[in-house]
Amino acid sequence: MADVETVHEILEYSPLILVVGGININLITSTDLIPEPGQTVTGNNLNITPGGKGANQAVGASRMGARVSLIGRIGDDQYGEQLLANLLAEGIDVRCVYKDSDAKSGIAIILLDKNGQNYIIQVRGANMLADTCEIKAAQECLPDVDALMIQNELPLKVTKKVAKDANVLGIPVIFDPAPSDNNIKEIIPFADVIMPNQNEAEFLTGIKVVDQVSARKASAILLKLGVSTVVIKMGELGAYYESAGESGFVSSVPIDVVDSVAAGDAFGAAFTVSIAEKLSLREAVKKGCAAGSLAVSKSGAQMSMPARSQVDSLIS
């Protein structure tokens, strides 16, 4: 469990971030050899840690100094209790995290290769039972928030409705389109910012993103889908960003990769808090890149989320 005193920052003004998204337990193992079909390999260890993109981003935003409310669903089981306890320890408002006895808590099975790159299988469990409770909770919270973070880990009707309601209120909607599926394009018109990684950008556009030129081509397609700003997370390369009047690229800070799990969530959290604080698009991307770089230097998902002071120190 995190040492809250050392990772959370006290700000004169703390923006309020609403995260509506997935809450999972992570089962993580590493191996020197990714198995071929029909092949059995040996894992080096097994770690059971809290995760889920929504929960990871909530923790990341909290450590960046924001006040954070999380809306989602867990199972009424041992993993659910563990997930809830960790969120509480991180200072997250979990009054609208619902326990459901009809499904088990979501699980992510994560395989790390020798370079720290991850391969993930999700069993969404209770996340997929999110319904009108989550929609109503979001409607009550939205008038007071400075930004909304969403992903694609809950049922489409929930994520789409929450994004639409926030859009009507003029609240910045930051959309992380993962996991990728054909539902994503129904949410995009209600998002202000879409933040795919390279694989997700390729899924949405058909463009294989390997450099700034291909990122620019993919961004042009995404902008035509109705979103106003595109930020493509490009791992160790950095991030490309584009809006109607601005585009650019921010390089990642070189760092030894230990575990790439949740690096994108760290990026998204730092970026969203920066947008809520009215920083420029480029400055928000710079903070996102710094947070992502710091996250890959540690093992785990929520445990690797950096503190605000670490992010600021890295880019100063």
Region spans (language model):
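Alpha-helix C-terminal capping segments
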Residues: 58-67, 112, 273-278
